[in-house]
């Protein structure tokens, strides 16, 4: 039955739909991280700058996806999953893809400049890091995991600079731990699902250390959150910061669920799709937002 499912050919999309798919809109939710500093610093009056910075990040990330797909056309065409991407499958003309990438780069820089020069420089830094990752760093075992986490941390820094607030080390530690766990799970999932061809410098013996790294990062998430809730920083921002600790076990439970999915070989090749399709992920996010609202006590 599995073999039959593997032979199904996806329906060829229309040119417009292919262009949209090439931008990878399913990856856009991670750019919401840019707006997290707005929420944690309570800089509500700067919502427009935060929103513009997020849009600039969407443009920047989509440009990177297009350039990567253009550079990896030959390899993607023989990949079991990537061969169905618009450029690799021929649904989108490479010339159109190049034109789209140029428009996104120019548009992303223009929007970032509207926010501030600092945000523009950070967007440019993101592109440089993405280029280094695609060309070399993604093939360096363990360092690639650190770079993956850096992409998410950089989004937080962009968001903080957009609202003209210093970067919170508490926030960096909290978000960094979550995405360190997910990055380790991503590499471990590739090892269990696709074997040697997907290892990028890892071997069969790397699976256990990757899962241990994911587990350690998962344990760090509630520790950071509990310590933050008892800090003077949280006391100055929240009416009842203790409510934040109620999110800790739920977030840790969801991350442990992700680790379990990796262990049994059920991890999707794209962790973002895995999270979007997982009702437990949405439940953890909803509960975290509820705890955030209760900690604020806006009715006071």
Please place each PLM-identified region on the residue numbering.
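Topogenic membrane-insertion module of multi-pass membrane proteins
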Residues: 1-77, 90-103
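C-terminal membrane-associated helical module and adjoining short loops/tails
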Residues: 2-20, 27, 135, 153-300
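Short, amphipathic, aromatic/basic-enriched membrane-interface segments that mark the entry/exit
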Residues: 18-26, 86-97, 114-119, 137-145, ...
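Long, highly hydrophobic alpha-helical transmembrane signal-anchor segments
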Residues: 30-48, 137-166
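Generic alpha-helical transmembrane segments of integral inner-membrane proteins
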Residues: 32, 36, 51, 55-62, ...
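Short, aromatic-rich membrane-interface segments at the entry and exit
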Residues: 46-51, 117-123, 141-145, 166-172, ...
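Acidic (Asp/Glu-rich) catalytic motifs at the cytosolic membrane interface
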Residues: 57-88, 143, 184-192, 257
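Multi-pass membrane catalytic core of lipid/isoprenoid biosynthesis enzymes
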Residues: 73, 78-123, 169-180, 212-215, ...
């Amino acid at each position: 039955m599995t073999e039959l499912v593997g032979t199904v050919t996806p329906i060829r999309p229309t040119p417009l739909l292919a262009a949209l798919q090439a931008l990878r809109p399913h990856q856009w939710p991670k750019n919401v991280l840019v707006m997290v500093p707005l929420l944690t610093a309570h800089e509500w009056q700067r919502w427009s700058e935060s929103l513009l910075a997020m849009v600039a990040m969407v443009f920047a990330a989509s440009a990177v996806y297009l350039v990567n797909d253009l550079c990896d056309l030959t390899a993607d065409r023989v990949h079991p999953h990537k061969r169905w991407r618009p450029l690799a499958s021929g649904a989108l003309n490479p010339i159109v893809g190049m034109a789209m990438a140029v428009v996104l780069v120019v548009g992303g820089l223009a929007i970032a400049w509207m926010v501030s020069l600092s945000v523009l420089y950070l967007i440019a830094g993101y592109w440089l890091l993405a280029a280094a990752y695609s060309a070399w760093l993604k093939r360096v075992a363990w360092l690639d995991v650190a770079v993956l986490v850096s992409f998410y941390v950089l989004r937080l820094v962009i968001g903080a600079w957009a609202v003209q607030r210093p970067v919170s080390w508490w926030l960096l530690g909290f978000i960094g731990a979550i995405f360190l766990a997910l990055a380790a799970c991503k590499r471990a999932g590739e090892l269990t699902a696709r074997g040697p061809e997907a290892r990028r410098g890892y071997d069969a013996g790397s699976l256990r250390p990757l899962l241990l790294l994911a587990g350690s990062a998962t344990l760090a998430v509630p520790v950071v959150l509990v310590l933050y809730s008892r800090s003077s920083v949280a006391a100055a921002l929240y009416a009842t910061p203790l409510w934040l600790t109620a999110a800790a076990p739920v977030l840790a439970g969801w991350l442990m669920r992700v680790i379990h999915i990796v262990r049994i070989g059920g991890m999707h090749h794209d962790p973002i799709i895995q999270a979007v399709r997982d009702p437990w992920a949405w439940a953890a996010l909803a509960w975290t937002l509820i705890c955030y609202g209760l900690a604020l006590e806006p009715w006071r």
